[in-house]
């Protein structure tokens, strides 16, 4: 297969949802339909050791939530699909945000009983930054759900995207009979399959087929025909151009737990979602089909292999081909390095990558030299843009039970901040260490990892900090004056960037007023 064909068949996407909308189950079933796993292990398998394939860090096993981002690759419908599993728990937004910068499309999973929830809104704001195309899956149709038309209206009004239903549910809860596939003009009858059983389904061609009346009863068949007439008249038609601009989403209905509807959604995703896209670098746009290799690091994760205390840098290949042993230019450090041991993933199971193409995600072993946002090329000095750091919303002071281990604590915190697990701030005026996060769970993760990886026992204390802002000023004199007058509120983050630590929002607003030439930023490019 030629290079252009290889790139053309790649589909790289992430799943976004509110916690508990069924994202981990969908991930499992996507892999099941892609034949990547033989048995779908659903989260918190009661009394069994069957943990979900994409939830593999110790803490995740305990809590039954997907905390870290795993990458899985599988073939489907003539394409090679790269699925980036994003942390679904309330608290893991920052990693999730960054993962969304590494994909070409997203699958939005909505609990049909609840509709659009808070976390989904936040994640959609991030996809807006790059107008990412979105495919929607309305999940849990085998439970009592809200009126489907009402949920579509909610998606349209709250997320600002037109909805084009591709399939439409027939009943719900105990009365869920299947879906009518509008594009194919056929009814697919629901039979529940669980775990790793993909059930045989029966399809009935045509909405007016008398077989449908026999299968679901005359009364229901009549009301389905009437409802669909209204739906097809009122809803948007699918428009590929609008989908690719992120303005319209195709919508599928089903139940991930019942193994139903996921394959229809995958067929749509592989058919319509874009192949690897052009990516903006500071110097120029980089096309996926360029022959020379380039890529950027969007995530660093420690301890992927409990047997080795290693860290893996996840790299999205933007253009060209990776081959085992090739030389790359690590642009930030200016060093040429030879990469012979990059890995591909199936959630915690690794395989050595011999060859990978634009759109693929590979893992580089990292001994502390690679940071989030780093660009690698075959020589050209490029810097890919759009990989953000987000100002934390929660803060704690961290201190040691054993004061002699200050050095290990600092080393551990700086390494954890480089991989985006948490942000660290060192005030200019004292020896405190302040930890900032986007969600509470990150604090637990940091303490448990400091203990298991750095042998450091740390505890938190409350601290009155409302928010943090990165400060920049093009006028050197003004910056000096600003620093002199605000010493008590200034700190350096893990990358030694000057940060304003605001005890209250009022304090921050006053500082912004007093120093109009200083920029206070809530996000910072890596």
Swiss-Prot record:
Localization, UniProt: Cytoplasm
InterPro entries per UniProt: EF-G-like_DII, EFG_III/V, G_TR_CS, P-loop_NTPase, PrfC, RF3_C, RF3_dom_3_sf, RF3_GTP-bd
Record GO biological process: regulation of translational termination
Main location: cytoplasm
Pfam families: EF-G_D2 (PF22042), GTP_EFTU (PF00009), RF3_C (PF16658)
GO molecular function, one term: GTPase activity
Keywords noted in UniProt: Cytoplasm, GTP-binding, Nucleotide-binding, Protein biosynthesis
Gene Ontology CC: one annotated term: cytosol
Domain tr-type G: residue ranges: 8-277
Ligand binding (GTP): 17-24, 85-89, 139-142
Gene3D superfamilies documented for this protein: P-loop containing nucleotide triphosphate hydrolases (3.40.50.300), Peptide chain release factor 3, domain III (3.30.70.3280)
Superkingdom of the organism of origin: Bacteria
Similarity comment: Belongs to the TRAFAC class translation factor GTPase superfamily. Classic translation factor GTPase family. PrfC subfamily.
Function: Increases the formation of ribosomal termination complexes and stimulates activities of RF-1 and RF-2. It binds guanine nucleotides and has strong preference for UGA stop codons. It may interact directly with the ribosome. The stimulation of RF-1 and RF-2 is significantly reduced by GTP and GDP, but not by GMP.
Database matches in PANTHER family: PEPTIDE CHAIN RELEASE FACTOR RF3
Name recorded for this polypeptide: Peptide chain release factor 3
Species of origin: Aliivibrio salmonicida (strain LFI1238)
């Amino acid at each position: 297969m030629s290079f252009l064909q290889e790139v053309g068949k790649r589909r790289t996407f992430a799943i976004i949802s509110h916690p508990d909308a069924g994202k981990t189950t969908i991930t499992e079933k996507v892999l099941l339909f892609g034949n990547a796993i033989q048995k779908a292990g659903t989260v918190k398998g009661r009394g069994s050791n069957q943990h979900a394939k994409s939830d593999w860090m110790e803490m995740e096993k305990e809590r039954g939530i997907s905390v870290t981002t795993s990458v899985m690759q599988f073939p489907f419908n003539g394409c090679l699909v790269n699925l980036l599993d994003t942390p679904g728990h309330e608290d893991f937004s920052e990693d999730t945000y960054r993962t969304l910068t590494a994909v070409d499309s997203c699958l939005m999973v909505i609990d049909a009983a609840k509709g659009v929830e808070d976390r989904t809104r936040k994640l959609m704001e991030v996809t807006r930054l790059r107008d990412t195309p979105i495919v929607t899956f309305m999940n849990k149709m085998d439970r009592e759900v809200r009126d489907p038309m009402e949920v579509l209206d909610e998606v349209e009004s709250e997320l600002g995207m037109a909805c084009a239903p591709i399939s439409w549910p027939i009943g719900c809860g105990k009365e869920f009979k299947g879906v009518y596939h509008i594009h194919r003009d056929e009814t697919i009858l629901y039979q529940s399959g669980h775990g790793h059983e993909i059930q045989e389904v029966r399809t009935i061609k045509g909405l007016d087929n008398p077989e449908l009346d026999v299968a679901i009863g005359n009364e229901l068949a009549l009301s389905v025909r009437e409802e669909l007439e209204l739906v097809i008249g009122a809803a948007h038609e699918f428009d590929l151009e609008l989908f690719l601009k992120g303005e319209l989403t195709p919508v599928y209905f089903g139940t991930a737990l019942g193994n139903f509807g996921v394959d229809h959604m995958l067929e749509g995703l592989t058919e319509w979602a874009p192949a690897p896209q052009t990516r903006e670098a500071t110097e120029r746009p980089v096309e996926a089909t360029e022959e020379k290799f380039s890529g950027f690091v969007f995530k660093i994760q420690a301890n992927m292999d409990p047997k080795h205390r290693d860290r893996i840098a996840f790299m999205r290949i933007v253009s060209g081909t990776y081959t085992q042993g090739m030389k790359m230019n690590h642009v930030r450090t200016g060093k040429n390095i030879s990469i012979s041991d990059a890995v591909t993933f199936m959630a915690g199971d690794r395989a050595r990558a011999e060859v990978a193409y634009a759109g693929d995600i590979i893992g580089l072993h990292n001994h502390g030299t690679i940071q989030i946002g780093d660009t690698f090329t075959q020589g050209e000095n490029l810097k890919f843009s759009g990989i953000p750091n987000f100002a934390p919303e929660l803060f704690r002071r961290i201190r040691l039970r054993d004061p002699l281990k200050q050095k290990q604590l600092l080393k551990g915190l700086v390494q954890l901040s480089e991989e985006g697990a948490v942000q660290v701030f060192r005030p200019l005026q004292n020896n405190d260490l302040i930890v900032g996060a986007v969600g509470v769970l990150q604090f637990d993760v940091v303490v448990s990892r400091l203990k298991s990886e750095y042998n450091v026992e740390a505890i938190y204390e409350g601290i009155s900090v409302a928010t943090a802002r990165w400060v920049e000023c093009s006028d050197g004199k003004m910056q000096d004056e600003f620093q002199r007058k605000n010493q008590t509120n200034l700190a350096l983050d893990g990358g030694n960037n000057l940060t304003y630590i605001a005890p209250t929002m009022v304090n921050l607003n006053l500082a912004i007023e007093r120093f109009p030439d200083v920029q206070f930023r809530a996000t910072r490019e890596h």
